[in-house]
C-alpha cells in the first residue's frame, strides 16, 4: 500500500467560498424588485436535481407526503424519522445562513448547494473557446422539497433558458430515482425549452476516482490499526423488489436479502424491461475497486450490500448491511470499512443509518466500523459531474419505463435494529 491518493481538507478548515450559486429561488432574501442575473449568453443552463430534505422537524409529514406521492404516513413513522433527524442535528428552528451564504440546516441541502456552487465556479473559470459549457449558469432543484423542480423551472423560463443539461445527483439509474426526477422535470418544462437528461452516470471514471480518494486513507488506517486486511463494504440504497420487476399479476414472490450478481439481474420476476439500478450500483463498486488496485486492494477485500431498506411491507432488495456485518463477524473479521457509493454527500442515511445504527450493530458483533468521508465538496466529484453532464452523446437514453405501482418512492427508513 505504498501508493497514495491526495486527501482533501475538511470543510470546516477551509476558507468560505464567497460567491453563492446564482439562483434567486435559493436566496430567501431576494425581493421581487431585484433584477435576477442575466441568463448565459448561450441560453443553455445546467440543472442539478436532488432528493431534498425537510428544513425543520415539523415539516416531516409534508416531506413524506412528497416522497410518497401524496400518501400520508402513519404517525409512528413520522415520529421515528423525526427522532433520527434530531440525532443528526435537525431542529424546529428555521435554519439561518452561514458566512458563506449557504443555509446552516440539513446537511443534504447545504452540501448540494455547495456542490452546485463549486460547479458554477469551475464553469466560470473555463475558457469559452475551449469548452461550450464555460460560464453556463447552474441551477438546483429538489424533487421532494424546496426549491421544487416546478419553482426552479419557472425561474429558468424567466431567465430565458432555451436549453438545459440536467443531471440527477443519484448516479445509478432507477425508476424510483432518475425516472421520477425526469417525469417531474418534463411535466414542469413542457415545451418551454429543450432538455438533455443524463439518465445515469454510474460508470463515470472520475466518480470512481472520487470515491477511491475518500476511502483509501481510511482503509490504510484501519489495516494499520488492526494489523489485518480489513474488508471494505460498499453500499447503495435499497429499493423495493417491485421496482426492478415488471408489473404483471403472475410475478412470483420476491425475497429480501438475496445478493444481486455483478454480471446481471437476479430473477425477481418477469423481467421484460428490467430496472438497471442493482447492476449499476455494482458497476460503481467494481470501478472503485479497480481504482484501488494500485494501492493493494484485491477482489477478496471487498463486499457489497444494500442499506436502509424501507418501512413498506413489501420486500426490498438485498443483501442487507446487518446480514453482511454478521457474516463478516462470523468469518472472524474484527473491523470493516464502509463506503456508501450511491450518495454524493452527508444526509440521514449516512449520518444516522451508518454512523449511529450500523456502527452500534457492528460493535455488538465485535466489529470496529470505519466510514469513508462522504464526497461532499470533493474537487474530483465536481469534475465528475461536469464530465457526466457534457458528454451527452454517450449518456442520454430513454426514460425508464413506468409501470403501475412504481411511480412513487417509499420512505427510505425502517425501525431501528432490535438489540438484545
Positions of PLM-derived features:
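Active-site-proximal alpha-helix that buttresses catalytic centers in soluble enzyme cores
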Residues: 2-15, 29-420
